[in-house]
């Protein structure tokens, strides 16, 4: 607090036109006065500035943005291509198998009535001979169709080999996403000055409140070199904080 004598001296200096002496008196009074608000602001500014400098030196974020994310995009495109190729092969094989299975079913249905007559002993000799010839043809057909079915089923099985490779790729992409999430949490911590648990509450604020806060903000300084109340480089920030004793 300023004393009465100091106030009188300051008024007298101003009345006498002693501006330099008045400025020195005010400066001495200011230096001797503890300002907790200023101290707190300076401490927070220094912590934020150091955190930002450390964040700028984090080369991992640059690597992720430059290499990992494009690489992950290519991997996901590869997974899509392999999955689409396997699906097409599987559907083509099924399309080939269905007519074969239907044809076998129809042939068996044609033989079934005469076979039932044979089993009940009600078939004539001529019909029995005809049945034997039809069964012989059916066996030849079944042999060829079963070979075709086996080949198509093998094709379906081989088409599923993409799952092992694509599964590894997807797991790597998930790992990258988790790392990016962690880095974003660090960024939020730097800019909000809060613990991760407190950020959840910040992120869950109503949208209208966020819009109001953003509309009240001044925004970035576009031309700091034209303003006397702004700094334009990291060195000037360091000098400013050092001059304030932080």
UniProtKB/Swiss-Prot annotation:
Does Hydrolase show up as a keyword for this record?
yes
> Main subcellular localization, coarse class?
cytoplasm
For this chain, one GO molecular function annotation is:
phosphoprotein phosphatase activity
Which class of enzymes does this protein belong to?
hydrolase
Which residue intervals make up region (Disordered)?
Answer: 204-246
Provide the E.C. number(s) assigned to this enzyme: 3.1.3.-
Site, as annotated: Enhances dephosphorylation of CheY-P: 168
| Function as written in the Swiss-Prot or TrEMBL entry | Plays an important role in bacterial chemotaxis signal transduction pathway by accelerating the dephosphorylation of phosphorylated CheY (CheY-P).
Q: What is this protein called?
A: Protein phosphatase CheZ
Where does this protein come from, organism-wise?
A: Vibrio parahaemolyticus serotype O3:K6 (strain RIMD 2210633)
């Amino acid at each position: 607090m300023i004393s009465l004598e100091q106030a009188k001296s300051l008024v007298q200096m101003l009345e006498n036109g002693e501006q330099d002496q008045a400025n020195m008196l005010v400066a001495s009074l200011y230096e001797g006065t503890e300002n907790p608000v200023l101290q707190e602001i300076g401490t927070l500014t220094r912590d934020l500035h150091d955190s930002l400098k450390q964040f700028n030196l984090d080369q991992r974020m640059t690597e992720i943005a430059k290499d990992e994310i494009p690489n992950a995009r290519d991997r996901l495109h590869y997974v899509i291509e392999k999955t689409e190729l396997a699906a097409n092969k599987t559907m083509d094989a099924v399309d080939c198998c269905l007519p074969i299975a239907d044809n076998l079913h129809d042939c068996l249905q044609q033989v079934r009535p005469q076979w039932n007559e044979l089993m009940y002993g009600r078939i004539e000799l001529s019909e029995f001979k005809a049945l034997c010839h039809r069964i012989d043809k059916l066996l030849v057909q079944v042999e060829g169709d079963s070979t075709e079915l086996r080949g198509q089923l093998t094709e379906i099985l081989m088409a599923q080999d993409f799952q092992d490779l694509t599964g590894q790729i997807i797991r790597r992409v998930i790992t990258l996403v988790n790392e990016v999430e962690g880095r974003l949490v660090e960024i939020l911590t730097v800019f909000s000055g809060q613990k991760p648990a407190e950020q959840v509450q910040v992120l869950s604020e109503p949208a209208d409140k966020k819009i109001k806060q953003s509309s009240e903000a001044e925004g970035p300084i576009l031309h700091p070199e034209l303003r006397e109340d702004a700094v334009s480089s990291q060195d000037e920030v360091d000098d400013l904080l050092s001059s304030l004793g932080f």
